[in-house]
């Protein structure tokens, strides 16, 4: 699971990509609302059960209307990056055609035409070094 450590830039990229698919009239009319909403997702105050208030600047908060769809799109984007990263020097475009995945939020079930023997340590290290993310090994 990665949603708590997801970089702001990636989350914002997906939110912007989704916004660009909106009807142009609505996009222009409600841009200020969208910008306010996204900014409050990117930097949010969270009340903890202990009564403490924390500021969170990473991740995608659960419970908002588009958490699952955002995580679906982020998950697919990350898988494409991961696939290209782990298969440098190979015909990634041809291999990607044989890749398949089922995504639900930050969970996934994938088939791949090639998987390195050291996949787990390499992918955990990639997420840490490239994105500053923690993923469960």
How would you name each of these model-derived features?
Residues 1-137:
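Core nucleotidyl-transferase/polymerase catalytic module
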């Amino acid at each position: 699971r990665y949603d708590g450590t997801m970089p702001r830039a990636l989350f914002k990229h997906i939110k912007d990509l989704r916004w660009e698919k909106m009807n142009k009239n609505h996009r222009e009319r409600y841009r200020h609302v969208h910008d306010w909403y996204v900014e409050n997702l990117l930097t949010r105050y969270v009340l903890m059960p202990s009564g403490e208030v924390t500021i969170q600047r990473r991740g995608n908060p659960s419970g908002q209307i588009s958490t699952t769809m955002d995580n679906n799109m982020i998950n697919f984007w990350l898988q494409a990056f991961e696939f290209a990263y782990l298969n440098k020097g190979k015909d990634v475009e041809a291999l990607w055609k044989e890749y398949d995945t089922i995504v639900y939020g930050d969970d996934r079930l994938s088939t791949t035409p090639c998987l390195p023997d050291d996949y787990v340590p390499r992918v955990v290290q990639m997420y840490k070094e490239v994105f500053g993310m923690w993923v469960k090994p």
